[in-house]
């Protein structure tokens, strides 16, 4: 990324300096010295040379940088094409999801075991002799003196 920024900055500065000084000097010299430069080959050669300098100094480095940026952006487009090898953050997220699923499965198994145990245990009569249902019937499991109330 830093290399890309350096290439862009240097290309812009060099391209600006070339365009500013060479074009202005060429235009001024061609306007002032039209009578001196009568050879059309020199003018065409200067324009072609200027175009080649622009191409090699300004356009070519910036186009390669632009292509690199496009490739990086297309390879990091996670919404459309998720990476085949998840990143460290992705691994941590997947581990957390797996742990949550395991905890949910353990809780579900514990609930199922508790339900099975509650279904297999016999129902014990835990009513005391003074409840509304059994106030006239003594409870045989309690070994105390009980009185029947009428």
UniProtKB/Swiss-Prot annotation:
The keyword Amino-acid biosynthesis does not apply. Disulfide bonds: none annotated. It is a multi-pass membrane protein. It comes from the Eukaryota. It is found in: Membrane. Keywords: Membrane, Transmembrane, Transmembrane helix. The chain crosses the membrane at residues 4-24, 42-62. This is Putative transmembrane protein DDB_G0277665. It comes from Dictyostelium discoideum (Social amoeba).
């Amino acid at each position: 990324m830093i290399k890309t920024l350096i290439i862009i900055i240097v290309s812009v500065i060099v391209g600006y300096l070339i365009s500013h000084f060479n074009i202005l000097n060429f235009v001024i010299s061609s306007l002032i010295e039209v009578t001196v430069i009568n050879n059309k080959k020199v003018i065409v050669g200067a324009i072609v040379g200027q175009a080649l300098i622009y191409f090699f100094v300004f356009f070519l480095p910036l186009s390669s940088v632009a292509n690199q940026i496009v490739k990086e952006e297309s390879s990091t487009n996670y919404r459309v094409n998720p990476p085949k090898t998840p990143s460290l953050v992705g691994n941590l997220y997947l581990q957390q999801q797996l742990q949550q699923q395991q905890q949910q499965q353990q809780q579900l198994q514990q609930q199922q075991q508790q339900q099975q145990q509650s279904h297999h245990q016999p129902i014990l009569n835990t009513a005391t002799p003074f409840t509304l249902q059994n106030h006239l019937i003594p409870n045989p499991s309690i070994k105390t003196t009980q009185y029947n109330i009428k």
